[in-house]
Each structure stands twice: as C-alpha cells, then as structure tokens.
C-alpha cells in the first residue's frame, strides 16, 4: 500500500524548479524570433521613455514622465508594461503615478494577422479594459469593448487610445469616460526609444 495521501497534491513535496527557462525580449537583435503575425507591430517593440501631460474634469492638469516596455517571447502577442511618475515645474520627480500591464494580440484569419487587434489592459487601481482596434501603417487605434472594475475601483466606463510611431518616436493620446463624464482627453505623451 502506498504512503501517499490521495488528498495531498502530488507537487506538494516536489523539489524546487529552476528559474523561468524562456526568454522575453524588447530587442529584436536578441532573444526569440518574432512571431510572424506580429510583423505589423515590429516598430513598437522596445523600451520607450518620455514626457506627457494629463488632466480630467475632476482633477488638475499634471505633467508626467513615463516608461513603456513592449516585448515578446516568440508567441503571437506582445507584452505591454507602462509606469509613469509625476513631475514638478522643474521636471523633478514628485511621486509614482499610473502603472499598467497588458497584452496586444492580432486578430487572425487562419494563421495570418489581419489589421485588427485586441488589447487587454489592467491597472493596480482595479480597472481592466478589453480594447478592440485597427492598425493602419504605424498607427494603432483602440476603443474599449468592455470595462471590468473591482467594487472599490473608480468608475471607468470607456476608453479610446491612439498610438503612432512618428519620426521614430512613440506618440499616444488617451481618452477616458469616468465618474459621470463621457469620453474626454486624459493623457498624451511623446516617448523616444531608449532600448531595443
């Protein structure tokens, strides 16, 4: 008769595992080969850093700095990570600001990418957004299809984002519908490539 407890999961006493064995890269010169369905977003892959301006009817306008990292691991999606920090009038950091994680995925027709894209975006403030959009050249435009919030999150009901690569820089504008307001400009920034 076995000494194993049938109610105990088999991994409970298993030895530790090594670190994650697969590479993720924001640099197309190293790491895994880019999945062919992502070729249309190749210019976005990298680490971007720059400045922007934000505001909303319920808050004062503010200046911020931001770093965006767009990477891949060889599969048919991109990983999007963003972190921002507020700046004072002399461009000195004041405090951390928005953070966001997400994934950009092409809509496929068989095994080929179309110009349609899906984006899943999540913030630590309890808001998750599902965006649907299209790529035109080096421009991506997304609009929310659904917004999910935790019970304690601020009321966000819709969003619209426009990204573009212009003269080698990453530019974006973001509109948000929240706390009783319709879609209203919220953030815009210009970031330059610092890695990748």
UniProtKB/Swiss-Prot annotation:
Keywords: Heme, Iron, Isomerase, Metal-binding. The keyword Isomerase applies. Binds 1 heme b group per subunit, that coordinates a highly solvent-exposed Fe(III) atom. It is an enzyme of class 5 (isomerase). It comes from the Bacteria. Gene3D superfamilies: 2.40.128.20. Heme b binds at residue 186. Belongs to the nitrobindin family. Heme-binding protein able to scavenge peroxynitrite and to protect free L-tyrosine against peroxynitrite-mediated nitration, by acting as a peroxynitrite isomerase that converts peroxynitrite to nitrate. Therefore, this protein likely plays a role in peroxynitrite sensing and in the detoxification of reactive nitrogen and oxygen species (RNS and ROS, respectively). Is able to bind nitric oxide (NO) in vitro, but may act as a sensor of peroxynitrite levels in vivo. This is Peroxynitrite isomerase. The lineage of its organism: Bacteria, Bacillati, Actinomycetota, Actinomycetes, Micromonosporales.
């Amino acid at each position: 008769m076995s000494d194993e407890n049938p109610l105990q999961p088999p991994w409970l006493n298993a030895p530790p595992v090594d670190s994650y064995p697969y590479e993720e890269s924001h640099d197309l010169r190293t790491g895994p080969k880019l999945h062919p369905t992502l070729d249309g977003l190749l210019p976005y892959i990298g680490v971007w850093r720059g400045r922007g301006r934000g505001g909303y009817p319920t808050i004062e306008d503010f200046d911020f700095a931001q770093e965006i990292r767009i990477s891949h691991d060889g599969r048919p999606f991109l990983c999007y990570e963003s972190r921002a920090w507020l700046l004072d009038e002399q461009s000195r950091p004041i405090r951390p600001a928005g953070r966001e994680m997400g994934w950009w995925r092409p809509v496929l027709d068989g095994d080929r990418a179309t110009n349609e894209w899906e984006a899943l975006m999540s913030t630590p403030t309890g808001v998750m957004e599902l965006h649907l959009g299209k790529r035109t050249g080096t421009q991506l435009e997304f609009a929310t299809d659904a917004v999910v919030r935790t019970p304690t999150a601020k009321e966000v009901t819709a969003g619209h984002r426009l990204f573009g690569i212009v003269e080698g820089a990453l530019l974006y504008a973001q509109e948000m519908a929240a706390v009783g307001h319709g879609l209203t400009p919220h953030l815009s920034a210009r970031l330059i490539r610092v890695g990748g």
